[in-house]
Design a protein with these regions (language model features):
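Accessory nucleic-acid engagement/destabilization modules that flank
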Residues: 1-174
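Conserved helicase motor core of SF1/SF2 NTP-dependent helicases
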Residues: 192, 212-242, 246-273, 281-285, ...
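Extended, charge-rich low-complexity interaction segments
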Residues: 141-154, 300-327, 575-590, 644-650
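Conserved helicase NTPase motor core
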Residues: 179-214, 278-281, 285-286, 290-382, ...
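Pre-Walker A segment
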Residues: 131-217, 226-236
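Short, solvent-exposed polar/charged micro-motifs at secondary-structure junctions
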Residues: 42-47, 120-126, 285-293, 415-416, ...
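Generic hydrophobic alpha-helical segments
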Residues: 19, 23, 199-202, 229, ...
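Conserved P-loop NTPase-based nucleic-acid remodeling module centered on helicase motor cores
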Residues: 46, 58-95, 106-108, 122-132, ...
């Protein structure tokens, strides 16, 4: 039996904790789930909350929910009405799924209320049960066992994940074994979505204090944060929630998920958006942000980007540090949720902390978003110290197991695509390994299995990805060959090939245009690439949504019936069924550059299905590395390098990055003086 609860709060609830401990003594199914203070539903008024004290879901014993009385008494009239409403809410949700019914109305399992008391009696069909007789009462609820699929559907109804999957309308064949891309994506999206145990523990429970959620791209971090926002708003409709994020195009997804989850629990009512503040990190005139809003509400003059970059190579960190230095920040938010935490500087965390009333702050963090930044985030340094010199956040001082959760399963990427992304990102099959993880534990935190080696320098390492860390449906439907690589002599040939592939995807494979995303890794020629590609596609009747040309305040990544053309930065946090990565030869011109490798890693991990990588002659090195990966049965086999050899690469990349920032600053000054970008490029060409 698995327990979903804040154990600290549960232990403080003495009566309920005693019942929970008694249930642990029984031999229930290993897949059974016991929820504490969940599920919860909205009553007639926003202030009315209907909540189960304890609810047990089991494939053998059905559903039992408990009212734990603190003394030898009967239910009050108000409690009877409350429990009747809860009963109706639970049964109505379950009855919506035909898979859980036998006939038109009757469920395949029993839904039973047990009132835990010192008595053993039935009054008005209400069963009062003492702890010594609890096992017998549970046994009486036993019925024909549910199948794994049926129980999965039952849990999705309880958890609120039944609305999780976005259903896209695609033309489908009648052949259930069809391998058309549209049919494969349909079968994957129609598979019942349900939280795994790790996700349940963090999504359905909000602890009183800081909490970090770690996991790879596609492990469900955004889904968990949006569920937290919806449930907290259900329970505390008059309190303010901050949800902040880094990638502007995530706004639409975040708002949509919060609304879907809230409507599911609140009988299709809309959340009060005046209490849920979805704000970009920085913000500006056209886009609300945490920094810009904090300045406005606290009477502080905001610092513009152009001014901030004159004082720091990290302008956003500079403005956050500056506003904190004013000492004027007034706490506003009762719950703060930070998405894409790996992209934010420390002073932004400290600003969010200052804006949080009860320091109830939750952040999602991708340990591997930056290939060359493999050190785990230190929460103590991230949030800093108070005036006494004590760390504001220190996980070592709190024994709550929910304060730092790691999600091991990746739900977005096919297994081999994720392994390929790691292989290319780390340079495992490059002429030399470019980056290393410090120890075996770090590999395991990322959901891998260390088959050989201890991560000591010179060790022969063999790393695999357990098949159970990818949903079975994806393994079954997609197989192992999800990545293709093609080389071309010029841009025109490359764009023509990609146009033909996209046209075939839409016409023959029956994909929607908005199932497809193109990511260009050649920043220097991205405008030329997308201009040519757009013209070629429109000749075939295919429209594009070019994010390079989108206004700065754009909040969307997809536009219906358009193929998305994106930069790597704007693609972060988003996903697509079919991903084309063009201009990828630029990554292999300097094969040891980990910053460029990081871009390729991020691009590959946008896919829910297939990836096609294209580029010039140097793309052959990408193909060579992928062939070696396949020869090793999609395992990472390498000799553990020393810290010094990998640090050399890291330092070189950072030097290059700082030089590029300096060049960018000088270009901006020239543009502001009246020169055009074309004038500057012509000058550079003459100097070659």
């Amino acid at each position: 039996m698995n327990i979903i609860a804040d154990e600290i709060k549960l232990k403080q609830d003495v009566v309920t904790y005693r019942v929970c401990e008694k249930l642990k003594e029984f031999t229930l199914d290993s897949s059974a789930v016991l929820y504490y203070n969940f599920p919860l539903y909205r009553g007639e008024l926003p202030e009315d909350l209907i909540q189960a004290q304890l609810l047990l879901a089991s494939p053998q014993y059905g559903i039992l929910y408990f009212k734990c009385l603190e003394s030898n008494r009967y239910l009050t009239k108000e409690e009877e009405i409350y429990l009747d409403d809860l009963d109706v809410s639970i049964i109505n949700r379950l009855n919506k799924r035909s898979e859980l019914r036998k006939g038109r109305r009757e469920l395949k399992f029993n839904v039973t209320l047990l009132i835990i008391s010192e008595k053993d009696e039935i009054i008005d069909d209400r069963k009062y049960v003492s702890l010594p007789c609890l096992k017998k009462a549970i046994e009486a609820n036993k019925d024909a066992a549910l199948t794994d699929e049926e129980f999965n559907i039952l849990l999705s109804c309880i958890d609120g994940t039944s609305r999780l999957t976005t259903k896209k309308e695609r033309k489908i064949s009648l052949d259930n074994e069809s391998k058309l891309k549209a049919d494969v994506l349909n079968r994957i999206q129609n598979k019942e979505a349900a939280f795994d145990l790790e996700q349940k523990k963090v999504a359905l429970v909000t602890i009183d204090g800081p909490q970090r959620i770690r996991g790879l791209a596609g492990s469900g971090k955004t889904i968990i944060l949006t569920m937290k926002a919806a449930l907290y708003h259900m329970a505390h409709p008059n309190e303010d929630i901050l949800y902040t994020y880094y990638t502007k195009s995530l706004f639409g997804l975040i708002k949509n998920l919060i609304e879907r989850f809230y409507r599911d629990f609140a009988d299709n009512r809309e959340p009060n958006w005046k209490k849920i503040h979805i704000l970009h990190g920085w913000g500006g005139v056209e886009l609300g942000g945490v920094y810009s809003t904090a300045c406005m509400e606290n009477g502080i003059e905001p610092i513009t980007y152009n001014i901030a970059r004159q004082f720091s190579s990290n302008p956003f960190d500079y403005v956050c540090k500056s506003i904190l230095g004013t000492g004027k920040i007034a706490p506003k938010y009762d719950l703060t949720l930070i998405d894409e935490g790996q992209d934010f500087p420390d002073h932004f965390y400290q600003l969010c902390y200052a804006l949080s009333k009860e320091k109830r702050i939750v952040w999602a963090y991708d340990d591997f978003q930056n290939i060359f930044d493999i050190n785990l985030q230190d929460e103590k340094n991230t949030f800093g110290k108070d005036q006494k010199g004590d760390y504001l956040v220190d996980f070592s001082k709190n024994n709550n197991p929910l304060q730092d959760i790691v999600l091991h399963t990746c739900y977005r990427n096919p297994r081999t695509a994720l392994i390929a992304a790691f292989s290319l990102g780390l340079g495992i099959y490059n002429s030399k390994v470019l980056q290393r993880l410090e120890d075996n534990n770090h590999w395991e935190l990322l959901g891998f299995k260390v088959e050989s080696g201890h991560s000591d320098v010179g060790d022969q390492m063999v790393i695999s990805r357990p098949i159970e860390h990818t949903p079975n449906i994806m393994n079954q439907e997609l197989g192992i060959y999800t990545i293709k690589v093609s080389s071309f002599s010029d841009y025109a040939s490359e764009c023509k090939f990609v146009t033909q592939c996209i046209t075939q995807d839409i016409q023959d494979e029956k994909l929607r245009p908005d199932d497809i995303c193109v990511i260009c890794l050649d920043n220097r020629n991205i405008n030329a690439y997308y201009s040519l590609l757009s013209r070629m596609l429109i000749r075939n009747g295919i429209s594009t949504f070019n994010l390079v040309d989108a206004p700065n305040a754009n909040k969307h990544f997809f536009y219906e019936n358009n193929v998305t053309l994106s930069t790597i930065n704007k693609a972060k946090g988003n996903e697509a069924g079919m991903v084309y990565i063009i201009g990828a030869d630029t990554v292999f011109i300097n094969r040891d550059n980990v910053i460029l490798r990081n871009k390729l890693f991020t691009a590959i991990t946008r896919t829910k299905g297939w990836v096609t990588i294209t580029g010039g002659e140097k793309i052959k090195y990408c193909l060579e590395e992928l062939n070696k990966l396949e020869e090793n049965d999609f395992k990472l086999v390498f000799t553990q390098p020393s810290k010094e050899t990998t640090k050399t690469v890291e330092s070189g990349s950072k030097v290059q990055q700082n030089l590029l920032l300096d060049v960018q600053s000088k270009i901006d000054i020239l543009v502001n003086s009246g020169l055009s970008v074309e004038d500057i490029m012509q000058f550079i060409q003459r100097k070659k």
